[in-house]
Amino acid sequence: MNEAEGMRDKALRVLQVAVAEARGEPGTYVSRARIMQQTNISDLQEFLRIAEFLDEQGFIAEGVNEHEFFVLTLEGIAEGARY
């Protein structure tokens, strides 16, 4: 698995956990700390790279204070629920 594939896999896992945390409701703020804990990501910089990727894809928005809290978009919920 190359680095890009690894990033996509981790981003999908983060998205799936965030969808579960938000109970599938768009616009619901989720916590970076809870998502990091549930996905076993301990490196803040790694999480921030993943969050930026998800933001660029239009799956999350409204990241506050380095994505300490963020919301899922309709597209993000649909993508996270696909798998």
Predicted regions and their residues:
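Short alpha-helical segments that sit at the start of domains
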Residues: M1-P26
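Short acidic, hydrophobic short linear motifs in intrinsically disordered regions
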Residues: G24-Q38
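Short amphipathic alpha-helical interaction segments
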Residues: I41-E56
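A short, conserved structural fragment
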Residues: D55-N65
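Minor-groove-contacting beta-hairpin "wing" of winged helix-turn-helix DNA-binding domains
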Residues: H67-L72
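Short, amphipathic alpha-helical interaction segments positioned at domain boundaries
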Residues: L74-Y83
